[in-house]
Amino acid sequence: MAFISSGYNPEKPMANRITDIGPRKFDEFFPPVIAKNFGSWLYHEILEPGVLMHVAESGDKVYTVRVGAARLMSITHIREMCDIADKYCGGHLRFTTRNNVEFMVADEASLKALKEDLASRKFDGGSLKFPIGGTGAGVSNIVHTQGWVHCHTPATDASGPVKAIMDEVFEDFQSMRLPAPVRISLACCINMCGAVHCSDIGVVGIHRKPPMIDHEWTDQLCEIPLAVASCPTAAVRPTKLEIGDKKVNTIAIKNERCMYCGNCYTMCPALPISDGEGDGVVIMVGGKVSNRISMPKFSKVVVAYIPNEPPRWPSLTKTIKHIIEVYSANAYKYERLGEWAERIGWERFFSLTGLEFSHHLIDDFRDPAYYTWRQSTQFKF
């Protein structure tokens, strides 16, 4: 067989070498004014909800308009955003980590025209396509996971309850009346690919029943040892069962050990865990990532279970709106939701909000590392 050279020359190992096949370098996408003043900014201000101004050492100013957007978008919607960016922003726009979109302009005339254009664009039903807001002491856009549209283990939907919640708190998205920012996040199950456990308000889908076992198909669809190994609590074990006149290899589950995580279903399609009666959500509050005033902290469960109520999830949205209203009426300025709860005490939190306290809310997690490792920049040697 003839040797076919790949073009590699051992005497010149770096010749024609491709060292980066990922996304292009980020600074290639900067608007000209951002590229000019990169690393040389003096300060920024929030002029009004959804509108920011950054001032550079050179005196240049950048006006940013933040609009709420869906996490799952149609191609036509994305093209419309690109058309707006072409018209006002030289073809530049920016997606934020909370599913917002930011348009940046360099003068007040363009800012005014951009805001008027965004406010004029509406869906057929009358709702705004590009609502301006999500800055400062208000409710920003919701970060969420996949939900029923894609994932195989969700205990609740993502896009459905997120839409319903944002409709309920939309006034706070477009205003800054709250004591401090409120971050709301949603995860469809406790595997939490969206990481909502450090949010002011976190919604987490939970299963309450162990997986159902399709014994007839288990051995045909699954690698049983893999399903057994996937269980973090050793609740899954191999077994044999007689079905009709034949004995089959299958799986047994110790219900008292199951934590309803759905890992076994990921490994074995014959172990579906979704259940219309058992699935629902919990509400967690008090988390944050910021180091301001107090250290970062995890959220705590304050509502142990709310059933799924599609398409508008009325019990969930009503409870979240109520928590925000009580927080707004009682917290100090700049005080995050968790800081307010810790200042007044969690007993007082439940008293003010009227939420029911039960043994399901008691945090029994114990890990010495969590209490001994440094968790923030707030320490002294």
UniProtKB/Swiss-Prot annotation:
Entry note: cofactor: Binds 2 [4Fe-4S] clusters per subunit.
Residue ranges annotated for the 4Fe-4S ferredoxin-type domain, each copy included: 249-276
E.C. number: 1.8.1.22
InterPro entries: 4Fe4S_Fe-S-bd, 4Fe4S_Fe_S_CS, DsrB, NiRdtase/SiRdtase_haem-b_fer, Nit/Sulf_reduc_fer-like_dom_sf, NO2/SO3_Rdtase_4Fe4S_dom, NO2/SO3_Rdtase_4Fe4S_prot, NO2/SO3_Rdtase_4Fe4S_sf
Positions contributing to [4Fe-4S] cluster 2 binding: C231, C258, C261, C264
Source superkingdom: Bacteria
KW Glycoprotein (keyword) present: no
Residues that, per the record, bind [4Fe-4S] cluster 1: C151, C188, C189, C193
Keywords: 4Fe-4S, Iron, Iron-sulfur, Metal-binding, Oxidoreductase
Major enzyme class: oxidoreductase
Pfam families associated with the record: NIR_SIR, NIR_SIR_ferr
Record-annotated membrane-spanning stretches: none
UniProt binding sites for siroheme: C193
Assembly and oligomerization: Heterohexamer of two alpha, two beta and two gamma subunits.
PANTHER family xref list: SULFITE REDUCTASE [NADPH] SUBUNIT BETA (PTHR11493:SF47), SULFITE REDUCTASE [NADPH] SUBUNIT BETA-RELATED (PTHR11493)
NCBIfam families: dsrB (TIGR02066)
Function: Catalyzes the reduction of sulfite to sulfide. This is the terminal oxidation reaction in sulfate respiration, a process catalyzed by the sulfate-reducing bacteria.
Protein name: Sulfite reductase, dissimilatory-type subunit beta
Lineage: Bacteria, Pseudomonadati, Thermodesulfobacteriota, Desulfovibrionia, Desulfovibrionales
Gene: dsvB
